[in-house]
Amino acid sequence: MSDQMPFPFNNFTYFFTLFSKFFSSFHHCTCSLSVSRQYLALDGIYHPLRAAFPNNSTRRKHFTNNWDPRHTGFSPSMTSCSKEHRQGPATKLPSSNYNSDVEDARFQI
């Protein structure tokens, strides 16, 4: 054995405590979760687990019938809807040869 101990017993209280509030077998930068029946243990506080969707979510009509194609999920100031999703008449793009459509308009000096 070497003369130096790998763990200094005089500083033992700084490295280990029996209080569950302060002791964790994991590194402090990780988060340890444990699931016990209907509760989730996080930081010593038990939070009841809830389903992400209610049991009758397939019977609700607003998931499909009231869908607004103009809704992007973003704030109006952040983005606008794409042309495919806009309602109303489509805008006509100018032709590549914009002078060919005007035959009667002749300019005279």
From Swiss-Prot:
Keywords: Mitochondrion. GO terms for cellular component: mitochondrion. Disulfide bonds: none annotated. GO terms for biological process: regulation of cellular respiration. It is found in: Mitochondrion. Its main location: mitochondrion. Residues 62-109 are annotated as: Disordered. InterPro entries: TAR1. May be involved in mtDNA stability or mitochondrial gene expression regulation at the post-transcriptional level. This is Protein TAR1. It comes from Kluyveromyces lactis (strain ATCC 8585 / CBS 2359 / DSM 70799 / NBRC 1267 / NRRL Y-1140 / WM37). The gene is TAR1-A.
